[in-house]
């Protein structure tokens, strides 16, 4: 019987042990590398996810704004066939509004507002001008549309309703019915839907001249929930800068039926009444932005220029 080579056996055992240890160490290293790679991948994924989420959040914040400051301005150059008030009053060319300064709202600043909710801020068809702050809340801006409009919310030459077909001291029943609807302008906002109608002096009565002198109380008027805008008031117009007032020269003027309306309704009553039906104020053209009283008969018509009220937090200015 052969004796075991103890020395050789011992060496073999050591070698096997070293190999086993090496394999274990390599396994641990590989496991660590895999874990490290997974951890790195997870970290990268987490950072990318957070970054993308932040970017998307910022995009949503920006796109959720109702109005953005305009980058270009509307202008008009008169020709021999021009029929707007500015041109028929002897004008040659005009630029409407101003681009303004970042972080500051100035009367006449131009904005593009996504009132129809399609995600686009169309400078041609969704142009508005800042007028002033809402009297009851300085955190809300009052903006006026660039042109006359009808219920569909688009530029309209033919929309020219009476203020109120029966009398002018009961509120803008007929004029308000021709304002853009909430279906046409779903993103437009009004925070002052119900308010007192005043005369030009801030009073709440008018004098009607009949066979005797009669005093009529002006109503607290509520615009229908189906309309997305309101009419401008005499006081708001008087607070506008010349640049802002000149925006009303767009698409106003002429007395021919195919011309643009020669006046734009304001929701302010004439204190002295103006006959048995009463009268309200209107922006009159072609004598530029002159204020006049209308109507001479209840059915006399003017254009409507929609006004919206937008929280300043909903405006990118």
Predicted features and spans:
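N-terminal leader/signal peptides at the extreme start of proteins
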Residues: 1-9
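N-terminal single-pass transmembrane signal-anchor helix
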Residues: 9-31
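Aliphatic-rich helix starts adjacent to a transmembrane/signal segment
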Residues: 31-51
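Hydrophobic/aromatic hotspots within intrinsically disordered, low-complexity regions
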Residues: 43-45, 60, 73
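N-terminal low-complexity, intrinsically disordered "leader/linker" segments enriched in small/polar
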Residues: 47-65
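Collagenous Gly-X-Y triple-helix signature in extracellular proteins
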Residues: 63-317
